[in-house]
Amino acid sequence: MTASGVPTAGRVTKEWAAEFPGFDAWKSLHLLRRIGPVVQGICLDRTTGDDGYLPTVHVHALTREFPVVSLMLGQRSARPSGMPDPVLFARHERDFAHAVGALREQSRLPLDELPSIDEIVRQYHAEARRRLEKGHGAAVPEMEDSVLVAAAAGRDELAGEGLVLARELSASWPKSSMPFDWPGSDAWLDGLAVRAGDRESLLSVVRGQAIAHKLGKIRDHLAPDGVRHDRLA
């Protein structure tokens, strides 16, 4: 607590971590938990004026080389109107319990229980479908992550489902929304299938990304053999 009575970012981080003991504090205002080849996060994203934070849940796949932990499948805490629902640091003590409850209720993935690889992958699938339905363009990263996370976790059948869905959706993606270096659907799907079929290379990328993002202190709740650790002590 500062002299003005406004809680520090460190205290806010600790209080959120206490509410969600399955997560670990990764950085200031950012909690993570690792589930094998993917991390699930609670990011207390600072507001533009730096006087508050916006609770945001997300996931990030470790199966792609990426310079930062992304906010994929991000869901910001929202009011009934759909507008963002930030928490001012000056009102944190008053609004904290409401913010925690709202995030729990709104998150599509469980926060108190450990989501399975299946649940996470199917949320990628659902997001890809939503993007197409709403006209938001191609969901290339979502579909790639869904396939590669499943493959890295040894869920070959689930990865296969993702490849089938990727073929179905990519046929309807508007050309104007495709990445500038798009090789074409067939070449993309063939390349994705090859990457999914090389689990050892995927696991090597996962290990490298865990080191690059300094995840050593973040517990991995999925054992190397794919068995989940349901007791989050």
Regions found by a protein language model. Give the residues of each.
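Amphipathic alpha-helical segments
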Residues: 6-27
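Short, surface-exposed loop/strand segments
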Residues: 5-9, 34-39, 49
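A short acidic/basic microdomain associated with nuclease active sites
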Residues: 25-36
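Intrinsically disordered, low-complexity regulatory regions enriched in serine/threonine/proline
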Residues: 38, 43-233
